[in-house]
UniProtKB/Swiss-Prot annotation:
Description of how the protein assembles with itself and partners: Heterohexamer, formed by a dimer of trimers. The hexameric TusBCD complex contains 2 copies each of TusB, TusC and TusD. The TusBCD complex interacts with TusE.
Source domain of life: Bacteria
Annotated protein name in UniProt: Protein TusC
Organism this protein belongs to: Escherichia coli O157:H7
Pfam families from the UniProt entry: DsrE
């Protein structure tokens, strides 16, 4: 089976990309355990708890990221540079446990995957 990487690079509530990516991730996890999740650029905002999507008439799907453990999705990475650029601390309590990696290390890790799906 091919190794699949899901890359979240967009803000959570401006488009449906994040929600659709999460749905695809959970569905794919039923078919393979060779997958990982990467949060880069504005995608790091997907990890923040306490969002108020109802203020912009959006659905609150962020809590669904907590299901990753239940689905045995354990490989979660977050770009440390993206966190810094957005004024976020790697010690922030995220909705899922994601390991911070510098950009070079993150690219090397991402290169280990056969398929990369970006949301």
């Amino acid at each position: 089976m091919k190794r699949i990487a899901f890359v979240f690079s967009t803000v959570p509530h401006g488009t449906a990309a994040g929600r659709e990516g999460l749905d695809a991730l959970l569905a794919t996890s039923a078919l393979t355990d060779e997958l990982a999740v990467f949060f880069i650029a504005d995608g790091v905002f997907q990890l923040l708890p306490g969002q108020k999507p109802d203020a912009v008439l959006a659905r609150d799907y962020i809590a669904t990221f907590k299901l990753l453990d239940l689905y045995d999705i354990e490989q979660c990475w977050v770009c440390a540079a993206s966190l810094r650029e957005r004024g976020l601390d790697p010690q922030t309590p995220f909705v899922v446990e994601a390991t911070p990696l510098e950009a070079d290390a993150l690219r090397r890790e991402l290169a280990n995957y056969d398929v990369i799906l970006r949301f």
